Design a protein with these regions (language model features):
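Conserved catalytic-core motifs of GNAT/GCN5-like acyltransferases
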Residues: 30, 129-134, 140, 144-165
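Conserved acetyl-CoA-binding loop-helix of GNAT-fold acetyltransferases
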Residues: 99, 105-118, 145
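Acetyl-CoA-dependent GNAT
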Residues: 22-95, 100-101, 113, 153-156, ...
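Ser/Thr-centric signal marking residues that sit
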Residues: 81, 110, 132
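Conserved GNAT acetyl-CoA-binding A-motif
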Residues: 113, 120-132
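Conserved N-terminal entry element of GNAT/NAT acetyltransferase domains
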Residues: 1-33
């Protein structure tokens, strides 16, 4: 079951064509095969971006602890994902945010993040937190652009120099 459909226009050049694409968002869980395959792509991307920093964080990204997942599709092909997991009674942690390279720059990350925040509110969470790498400027811009504020590194990320953490009241 798809949660929502969002139509976007893609304009690679203002003097050329416009293409309508439909993004579908699906609520699921960490057992979803499309999510699993996107996480494999995410792992490859993170390892390439900074192998040492990624290896430090890897133990904290186990899929078994994730129950709420959004998978984004264009033309029925999975192109992005994100997840939430409970951090404490009032706080949800954003995990496994990823958009395939060929689908970036279209606002898909924002759509996934917005849907995750909505789902977290439906589950009565009040605050959203997350960690990303300092070597991920696109991710940092995504979170800042969606009103996340930088906070001191929390939990397992304390002392990790290459991590940066954010928070947002929902």
């Amino acid at each position: 079951m798809f949660l929502s459909k969002i139509e976007l226009f893609s304009t690679p050049d203002s003097h050329k064509w416009q293409k309508r694409m439909t993004i579908e968002l699906k609520r699921t869980n960490s057992e979803n095969e499309d999510f699993y395959n996107l996480v494999i792509d995410l792992e490859k991307y993170l390892t390439h971006a900074d192998e040492k920093a990624h290896s430090e964080c890897k133990p904290y990204n186990k899929l078994e602890t994730i129950k709420h997942v959004i998978v984004a599709f264009i033309d029925q092909k999975p192109i992005g994902c994100g997840a939430i997991r409970q951090f404490d009674k009032n706080t949800v942690e954003i995990k496994r945010m990823f958009v395939a390279e060929n689908a970036r720059g279209k606002g898909i990350g924002t759509k996934i993040l917005t849907e995750l925040e909505l789902w977290a509110k439906e589950l009565d969470f009040k605050v959203s937190i997350l960690e990303t790498g300092k070597m991920m400027p696109e991710a940092i811009n995504l979170y800042k652009g969606n009103n996340y504020k930088q906070i001191p590194n929390y939990g397992q990320y304390k002392g990790m120099e290459k991590s940066i953490c954010f928070e947002k009241e929902l």
